[in-house]
Regions:
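A conserved ligand/cofactor-binding region detector
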Residues: 1-805
């Protein structure tokens, strides 16, 4: 069926009548949004059936992308855009008496992720679909998502994010495909005719119910699926206890099961939290691999060719338990011997590492495995024993054996399990992969050098330019055509216009219109009035000390003090925009949010700063906010400690929208610099090797004593701000290190260089032609950071699957 404005109107009206019992005149905006979603869902479901039939008929190798996060954002406009139905859908909504912008705005962000990890997974799913790779994403259907951030008296407060009230319109529950996941109990084993017989008894059952979200590709009928698992108890409420008045006890087992899919990253600084997190991870991978193997057997009748027809890509260490769980199925259910099962597992699982931070390389208490996952624990012990023997035979070095051990000193190391059980291990930027090879996983790389690869991250450029920045998209189509939508390297053609003053003026006007649009958004949603004549200087990302929002705050204090000293100081007006969520248990990150808000309160209420300096913390940073902010941004702050950021993807989105980067040589900034040179970004700070070299002798207290400018800035933390809040704890953390190493992330070491880079940026901003030319150059050279390039690299070097060229 061909869809146009009229057929879409008919379909929407029918959905309203059949699902909500109302006419278009009676429908609410929410009902209208869900009706539109259902219409698009039906179109995608039809395409999905055709895609799966074709994949099965041609016996194509499938990619299974496992990630504890998928930060999908909103899907209505995205799916309409990919299906080439955005214009007719917008017109249909209008003719039914609604404002299309209001309907698109009704959709909540799907609460299935936190930061870059989840957004990357979402971008990759779009790209795999557009490139017509048969792929399924797998995650948990978190009912309350990460959390909704509220700023109260300058501090972060976490509220539940009930996104499914409206967001469930995309989900298709598949009750008939539910899987059973087992926790606890006892395991008995015996040998019968040279076969190991395993009996698991007295376990607790949890049902995993799949809810499927169809994913449309751009300019293709190919549709892939994101499968989200909901946890439910198979047991009904205990009616005997309920009738006796023991209501909570009667529903206890049900509540314990439901908790598994309730919240992303439950706090784990206590035993119960750790237990719930491990349950989440095992629930997710067990349901997933059972589903994959079941479908494989239905098609091929055997698991002996499983590795030839399936690739399991694990996004960070959270899905690592898929390795022992696949082994369990192959040995216990399929009756294979160890060697055959291990061969299959290690020829289909691939691992993407996303961090060099030691605290993020998961280590689980052995005791949790013994009690929660007794059979998996047995398999882990055997994997560990054999791996340890392999390491010993290679190195004959007890220290290296200990470092690479999977089970050691009462802990189970997920990253080492990934290395042992995967066919490929990749980093996500050239610098990050080099650190993995030469430092973090140096010994493993020495054993298996061919296993380690690099695939620099990429972004869904179709979402992050044409969908969110129609002004820029219009300019690009006028100048270079629409080929860049499917071949992002064609953005390079834009560089031919770097000397065209009319084009540069048009680019500047597009940016100004986007600033006005974001200012209207900020006023509506946060009640803040932005100075649109100021530089929009933006740092939005997860709040972590290594990302150094604190360095940015100190630089703002320095700028404010300069204005206080000399009110006639000639500086271009500057608006600093922050957006970040801190993990609920990360006290220091929460204090940095509080500091930024104290600073904002001080500066924004000082008449001296009016129309000159402004600081705004954007509440509840999320994908839909980023979609309005990034086209309006002029300066992109990418200032992590060199060697700590694996890649980053926000830097790529800003670059593609023409913002100029102030940044360190860290993560993908290194590759951006390779493309742009010193002339088109503002670099500063220590390099990764310099950070490690300095660490042995670094004394931030000495910097504090010797540098009067820095000392005055830091003393302001102790004095505090007009809200009466002081930050002695942050001062101590930077200068003296009360509970460990002072200034672990080299904030003070890079402070002077950062202030100088900001000064260079402000100076360049005054030269509008130069600035706009730099902006155009950034856009023109950003095509390499498209997810299509990254996915084609995965397909060629790791997955070995064909794709649409």
């Amino acid at each position: 069926m061909t869809y146009n404005k009229e057929t879409l109107k008919e379909a929407i009206v029918q959905k309203l009548r059949l699902n909500y019992g109302c006419t278009e005149q009676q429908a609410t905006d929410g009902e209208m949004m869900k009706a539109c979603a259902m219409v698009l869902r039906d179109i995608m479901a039809e395409h999905g059936v055709q895609t799966r039939e074709e994949t099965a008929h041609e016996e194509k190798r499938k990619v299974h992308y496992l990630s504890l996060e998928f930060l999908m954002g909103r899907s209505l406009m995205k799916n309409a855009f990919n299906l080439a139905l955005l214009e007719p859908l917008t017109a249909a909504i209008g003719e039914l008496g609604f404002k299309a912008a209001d309907i698109f705005d009704m959709e909540p962000d799907a609460g299935l992720g936190n930061g870059g990890l989840g957004r990357l997974a979402a971008c990759y799913l779009d790209s795999m679909t557009t490139l017509e790779i048969p792929a399924t994403g797998y995650s948990i259907c978190y009912e309350l998502g990460i959390f909704k951030q509220k700023i109260v008296e300058g501090q972060q407060v976490e509220l539940p994010d009930d996104w499914m009230q409206l967001g469930d319109a995309w989900l298709l529950p598949k009750l008939q495909e539910a899987e059973e996941v087992r926790f606890g109990g006892k395991v008995r084993t015996r040998w019968d005719n040279n076969h190991l017989m395993v009996v698991h008894e007295d376990y607790t059952r949890v049902l995993a119910i799949p809810c499927d979200m169809e994913i449309a590709g751009y300019d293709t009928d190919h549709v892939n699926t994101l499968r989200l698992w909901q946890a439910r108890s198979p047991k009904p409420i205990d009616m005997k206890l309920f009738s006796e008045g023991q209501y909570l006890h009667a529903a206890e087992e049900r509540a314990m099961a439901d908790a598994i899919s309730q919240v992303l990253y439950p706090e784990d600084n206590h035993y119960e939290g750790k237990s719930l997190r491990l349950k989440q991870q095992y629930f997710f991978v067990s349901a997933t691999i059972q589903s994959i193997t079941r479908k494989h057997i239905q098609q091929y009748g055997t698991l002996r060719n499983f590795h030839e027809k399936n690739v399991i890509q694990i996004n960070d260490t959270h899905p690592t338990l898929v390795i022992p769980e696949l082994m369990r199925i192959l040995i216990d259910d399929a009756g294979m011997g160890w060697d055959e099962a291990w061969h299959i597992t290690t020829h289909c699982v691939a691992y993407t590492n996303h961090t060099v931070l030691s605290e993020a390389l998961e280590v689980w208490p052995q005791q949790l495995f013994e009690t929660l996952l007794p059979r998996v624990w047995q398999i882990l012990q055997e994997i560990s024993r054999r791996w340890q023997q392999q390491v010993e035979d290679f190195f004959h070095d007890p220290a290296k054996t200990a470092k690479l051990a999977i089970i050691w000193d009462g802990g189970v190391r997920m990253a080492n399990l990934c290395i042992a059980g995967s066919m490929a291990v990749n980093g996500v930027s050239a610098l990050h992969s080099e650190i993995l090879r030469k430092d973090l996983f140096k010994d493993a790389c020495q054993m298996m050098p061919d296993k380690f690869k690099n695939v620099t991250n990429g972004i869904d450029h179709r979402r992050w330019v044409p969908q969110i920045n129609p002004g820029l998209d219009g300019l690009l189509r006028d100048l270079i055509g629409e080929g860049y939508l499917t071949h992002p390297q064609e953005l390079k053609k834009l560089e031919a216009y770097a000397g065209d003053k009319a084009v540069l003026r048009r680019l500047e006007d597009i940016k100004h219109q986007n600033k006005l649009a974001f200012a209207a958004f900020a006023r509506k949603h946060q009640g803040v009035v932005l100075n649109t004549d100021a530089i929009f200087d933006v740092q939005v990302k997860r709040l972590h000390e290594y990302k150094r929002q604190l360095l940015n705050a100190l630089q703002i204090i320095y700028l404010y003090q300069r204005l206080q000293d000399d009110p006639s100081l000639d500086l271009p007006p500057q608006t600093f925009l922050f957006g970040a969520k801190a993990a609920p248990g990360y006290a220091v990150a929460k204090r940095i949010i509080h500091l930024i808000n104290s600073l904002a309160d001080q500066i924004n209420s000082d008449p001296l700063c009016k129309d000159r300096l402004q600081v705004v913390f954007l509440e509840n940073y999320r994908v839909s906010l980023a979609e309005v902010l990034m086209p309006a941004s002029e300066v992109s702050q990418q200032i992590s400690t060199a060697g700590k950021e694996a890649s980053g993807t926000g830097n790529m989105k800003f670059m593609m929208n023409g913002a100029l980067t102030v940044g360190t040589l860290d993560g993908a900034n290194v590759e951006m610099h390779d493309l742009l040179g010193d002339d088109n970004m503002f670099l500063f700070g220590l390099h990764a090797d310099e950070v490690e070299h300095l660490r042995h002798t670094y004394d931030p207290n000495l910097l504090y004593q010797r540098d009067p400018v820095l000392r005055r800035v830091l003393d302001q933390l102790k004095v505090g701000f007009r809200d009466g809040v002081t930050y002695e704890d942050l001062f101590q953390r930077l200068v003296t290190g009360m509970d460990g190493q002072a200034d672990q992330y080299m904030v003070l070491a890079d402070f002077a260089a950062y202030c100088e880079a900001e000064s260079r940026m402000r100076h360049t901003y005054r030269d509008r032609e130069t600035w706009n030319r730099m902006s155009l150059t950034n856009i023109a050279r950003s095509g390499v950071f498209a997810a299509d390039r990254a996915i084609s690299q995965y397909a060629d070097t790791i997955w070995h699957v064909p794709y649409k060229q």
